[in-house]
Amino acid sequence: MKLYYEKRGQGDPIVFVHGNGEDHHTFDTTVEVLEADHTCYAVDSRGHGESPSVEELHYEDMADDMVEFLETHDLNNITFFGFSDGAIVGLLTAMKTDRIGRLVICGANTEPRGIKGWAYRMFRGAYFLTHDPKMKVMLREPHITEEQLKQITIPTLVLAGDRDMIRERETKKIAAALPNSTLRILEEATHISYGQNSTRAAIEYIAWVQDLENR
């Protein structure tokens, strides 16, 4: 599938993938921070933004789209920067290609019940009213095992907020299973506040990369 994207900056490539119901503008502020030293590709996932609409959404299909995107644009050794659903797609994409050199996952879950109960009930109610495929995929997917996570050996920054809608034990489980991960639980941060149009994740990313380079 041909995905819409916007490209800004120059330097090491970063591919940004947004969350559910969003589009590439989720990362406008993040890109502003990073574009001086990076070529930033902000992508609209299938069924979102200006990319083609679909009747059904599945995270595996979205990951396949990203593999195709990297191959089409001949991108190698990229940083994959995913928020929420985009973080799920990042994990799955990293299992499918060796074109990713570093991974940043913000607010990821490996199973639907990794979402806190109040949020899950809210999404279930929204799906009951709208039958929106974007709601449906959150209620039924993903199903990523710890064994699968152990296959991802690239450096990975795992971010979440201390007030995130993702259960903290879920975030810690993901970080523990990834062999080469760094975990950051951000104080006074909700699921949205550090991920959408925020400098916070960008600052955490810069500090993490500097730490990797100094090891």
Predicted regions: what they are:
Residues M1-I14, D37, I206, Q210-R215:
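Alpha/beta-hydrolase fold catalytic core
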Residues E6-E50:
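Conserved HGGG/HGGXW glycine-rich cap/lid loop of the alpha/beta-hydrolase fold
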Residues Y41, S45-T79, I203:
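Active-site loop/oxyanion-hole signature of alpha/beta-hydrolase fold enzymes
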Residues I88-M95, L103-H131:
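Flexible "cap/lid" loop of the alpha/beta hydrolase fold
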Residues P133-Q148:
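Active-site nucleophile elbow and catalytic-triad environment of alpha/beta-hydrolase enzymes
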Residues Q151-I152, V158-A160:
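Short beta-strand/loop motif that positions the catalytic acidic residue
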Residues M165-E170:
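Conserved alpha/beta-hydrolase "acid-adjacent" motif
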Residues E187-R215:
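Catalytic active-site module of serine/aspartate enzymes centered on a nucleophile-bearing elbow/loop
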